[in-house]
Amino acid sequence: LVGYTLVTATLLVSAGRVSDMYGRVRLYNAGFAVFTAGSILCFFVQGQGNTAALELIVFRLVQGVGGAFLFANSAAILTDAFPPDQRGLAMGMNQIGMLAGTFGGLLLGGVLATIDWRAVFLVSVPFGLFGTVWAYLMLHETATIRAHQRLDLPGNVLFAVGLTLVLVGFTYAIQPYGNSSMGWGNPSVIGEIVGGLALLAVFIAAERRVPDPMFRLELFRIRMFAAGNIAGFLSSLARGGLQLVLIVWLQGIWLPLHGYAFEDAPLWAAVYMLPMTAGFLLAGPLSGALSDRYGARYFSTGGMLITAAAFVGFLTLPVDFDFAPFALLLLMLGIGMGAFASPNTASIMNAVPPEHRGASSGMRATFQNVASSLSLTLIFSLVVAGLSSSLPGALYGRLTAAGIPSGVASNISGVPPVGALFAAFLGYNPMATLIPGSVLAGLPSAARATVLSNSFFPQLLAGPFHDGLQVAFSVCVVLSLGAAAASWLRGRRYIHDYEVGQSAKVAQEPVVTHVGSGGASTTKRAEAAGIGRSPPTSTSGRLTPYCACPVSGQSPAPPPHSWVNMISSSPDRMTPTIASATDSAESALTDHESPPT
């Protein structure tokens, strides 16, 4: 479950940093190809048991590498391609595609799983192949490539190892250890978490001393960048594990209790989650477009307040709830998350200098992926804690009521809560193996049929699982309110005006290009497009930014067409334009490159 997320989270910042140096589109294209190759390899996993499981884990790691290349660059590419007054809408449309793909995959996976579990991985292949070809043919580099910078290899190693230890430690923390229902007392878990945090502390200290750091710590001096990432982290921590928990609730408990056969439960669980997707589809582009005009503060804050209200509503649901209020709360949850996501992402990307957008996008995605991984552990730890307190008594009472001897029932009631939870999720009743055959043979036929039925475990877990969910939803309310507070503290709308500096560099310096197969150099096409003209100046001779900083209540004007940073239109698909900086241009921009804190 965590291998893909683990690899993606550890590589996101590195992928973003590499894309700043060698090109975002190039790495984005590679992401499609690698992810598709990983999906094909997963489909061809052979056999059963440990060997097949190991192969599947390795190939999922390959998918994670491709996913990191994609996630690290999507927001940066959109920020480069769209003017500031359209970026919120662009982010909203992008996130709609991601969410629609996620739930579309759940639906298709539910159908294909009834045929062959390997076929689930085929869902990604046609989209991946199309994306690889389309991105290669249609996407062109619009960012300035800075290949002269060096990759921080020691920093990459420290970050990857430290984060891996932390995430692995938290993952194994939900496994039983000794007589405990969870592994928080396991010395290995404690050692992994402490060791990982220590390496991350060393990483942060080292990043302050290298000339080309992997993690641009100075970006946290920008208030909107810092507040936006804190809000995004808390938001992902609140909702990251929510989808899986809700699917477990539906697929493992609610649907079987309402007469659905287990083989149909995965498909119907995805169908019943659609109201959340609908809410996101409604709110995402709308809030993004409005935030382009009015700023992200009100929409991102309001979105998290709606999310918190939805979690409060989940607290009021009974164990055997009606679907109508459940669907309404899912819709609220989707609206809240959609209203928050695209304005928050756009405000983060608007706040940073263009030359750091790849690294900034990777940092933003890393915070969200790490929070989602930690959320999975947090939510399941809270649910398992609730199960631990009430499951043994419920299990003992149900077994003795069915005629199981007290001693046998007492032994069975010590089953690990995690095992019981996933047994219900997988549609497996372990009573046939836990209860001795001689005891089962001595039970009346009706009692034996009840104990061995597929509905026995869902009925047994419904109450204890609901107790754990109450604790988890309460924590999610607090985290959502924290994200709302961070969103509000981002301050007034701010868009970094460093694009003018980049335009000045392009205008004042010769353009270094490659010659395309058609024979015409990009330099001539750039001159024809207007590059080389001087940017507008104020009466004092200073450069006039096209986007004032901060902006309050007005839409920023898009940059003139003649100020593009890079032209890429040669027949051989991509010819990056590399502009060099001059001391005169840097000195002319001194007053424009320091964002308010």
Predicted ranges, named:
Residues 1-7, 185-191, 195-199, 211-355, ...:
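Transmembrane core module of solute transporters
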Residues 95-96, 100-103, 232-233, 242, ...:
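Small-residue-rich alpha-helical segments with characteristic i,i+4
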